[in-house]
């Protein structure tokens, strides 16, 4: 998206710039000192090339890099005027916690262009939840993994597991066949990496996963084998092991057991959350699927501050970590029905069970009230975070919660069933 505002008078420019930044950044602005440039426009352009001007600073307001230029220093000062946000306890915070200036490395040609798609993974933004968090005494900030290249947190482990196996000499492009059981998002994360590096990929997935996921996987060239939905991820794992035995040069990445899974979150996701909150995160909330996100992030944050609470989320219908039994549920991506080896249970202070219905309803409300189109597991994580944020003992605290995937790949699921039925019945107006 490119937005350019031209005006004849710089006061009007500054006012418009402030309004646009306010809207785009949720009434929180990026700011820094900047020398005036020769441009008479405000330019917001993701992934623009580096400017030749030494006075131009680069900003991070989203996963992309944006360029900001103003006709005068006073324009910039006015448009970038600091805004403060009140915590639930009445204190105020510096808005730089939300938007951080960064300097991106450039190639030998000086252009700010990634060499390949894997370089776009990570450094996702965080955003406060507002309307949906009414009645909460703590603040909730969502880590938007929906803004990864393929719109899910699993992009990170797709990259890390393939890269790790390559570095150890286990696989090589054009020869090895990658095999993996998946609920969908890990498969997509693997599929775009496999496509970019030249691997054949075979995925096994419960038939209960969304149609959008199937289409996406096939679009990337992956081979897809559906398994009995009643057997959950256990059935997908068993089928993958069978394929592994019968396929020459096959290699299973084993997301549930692979240390490269939590490692990438320890090395990237955790530090990103810590840096974006300036170490002020009090509670971390994440769904439990493979265990990689909560284990990796939890370890990093606990090392930085042992007092930080780490809270996991699982489906009520399959609450094995809470002492229940595995069972079918509608929260795709969490609640595998078994305890993954990658899950460090000692890192968690609490596990909250959220029903499929509550997860779906919360995901709907995130779209309607926050403008965030997220998947069902994001709804589950948000529902748990809201419960925690309403506890009196958490007044004034900052809760970070991971939103794992984008909602568009759930259009065929119960999440949007009523809307889908409504639009299918729509007729053109005469």
Curated annotation (Swiss-Prot):
One of its GO terms (biological process) is cysteine biosynthetic process from serine. SUPFAM superfamilies: Tryptophan synthase beta subunit-like PLP-dependent enzymes (SSF53686). Pathway: Amino-acid biosynthesis; L-cysteine biosynthesis; L-cysteine from L-serine: step 2/2. It catalyses: O-acetyl-L-serine + hydrogen sulfide = L-cysteine + acetate. It is an enzyme of class 2 (transferase). Belongs to the cysteine synthase/cystathionine beta-synthase family. PANTHER family: CYSTATHIONINE BETA-SYNTHASE. This is Cysteine synthase, mitochondrial. It comes from Arabidopsis thaliana. The lineage of its organism: Eukaryota, Viridiplantae, Streptophyta, Embryophyta, Tracheophyta. The gene is OASC.
